[in-house]
Amino acid sequence: MLKLKICGIKDEKNAKDLAFLNIDFFGFIFAKSPRRVSLEQARNLSAIFHEKDKKVVGVFVDENLEQILRCIKEAKLDGIQIYRTITKEEFEILKVQNVFVWQVISVENSLDLKSEIFANLVLFDAKGILKGGNGISFDWTLLGSYTKDFILAGGIGLDNVHKAVQTGAKILDLNSKLEDEKGLKDINKIKQILKELKK
C-alpha cells in the first residue's frame, strides 16, 4: 500500500488543515532551509498531527547524534530522515528510541550505494543546491536496479505523480511542488494529488 509524506511543514494553521487529509507522514526540517523549524515549533506541530494519529519525521543534514536525540525527545518524533551517513552504533542507539530511520541518498547520474547502509529505509532524492526541497527530479529509471523497499523524493507533483508511483516506491515524499506563493502547503493541490492517486 503506497504511503505519502509531506515535508517542510512549519505553520500551525496549515498543519491543522493538513492533519485532516489522508497523508501518513509529515516532515519538519531542522536543517538550514527556508522551511526550517525551531524545537518549539516542532513540538507544537507534532501535537497537532499526533492528535490525528499521523506520524512525524524530523529532517536532519549534519546534526550530531546528541542534537538529533534531543529533537526526538522534545518534539516527540516518530522517525528521522537524515542526509549524512548513519553509523551502525548510531542506528542501534536510535532503534532504542523507537524511531525509524530513513537514510537519504542524493542521486545525480547513478545510485551511489557503495557503502553499507544502516537504516530502516533508503530515501532517494535528486542532488540539488539544497539538501532537499529543490523541486527537481532525477532519472527515475535508475531505480530499476534497486530491489529493496525505498522512498522517492524530488520534484513530485501533479504532473508526474503517476510516473513516481510506477517506480515501485513504498512512500512518496512531496514538498515544494505543493506550495503556494507564501511557502505554505496548498490544500487544494494536495487534494488533487490524492484524487489522482485513486484513479
UniProtKB/Swiss-Prot annotation:
Record-level Gene Ontology MF annotations: phosphoribosylanthranilate isomerase activity
Task: Quote the Pfam families the UniProt record gives.
Answer: PRAI
Substrates-to-products reaction catalysed:
N-(5-phospho-beta-D-ribosyl)anthranilate = 1-(2-carboxyphenylamino)-1-deoxy-D-ribulose 5-phosphate
Question: EC number(s) of the enzyme?
Answer: 5.3.1.24
Which pathway is recorded for this entry?
Answer: Amino-acid biosynthesis; L-tryptophan biosynthesis; L-tryptophan from chorismate: step 3/5
The EC category is: isomerase
Asked if Amino-acid biosynthesis is a keyword of the record, the answer is: yes
Q: Output the GO biological process annotations, alphabetical, semicolon-separated.
A: L-tryptophan biosynthetic process
**Which keywords does this chain's UniProt record carry?**
Amino-acid biosynthesis, Aromatic amino acid biosynthesis, Isomerase, Tryptophan biosynthesis
The family database entries (HAMAP family) matched by this protein are listed as: PRAI
> Which family, according to the similarity comment?
Belongs to the TrpF family.
Name the UniProt record assigns to this protein = N-(5'-phosphoribosyl)anthranilate isomerase
The species this protein was found in? Campylobacter jejuni subsp. jejuni serotype O:6 (strain 81116 / NCTC 11828)
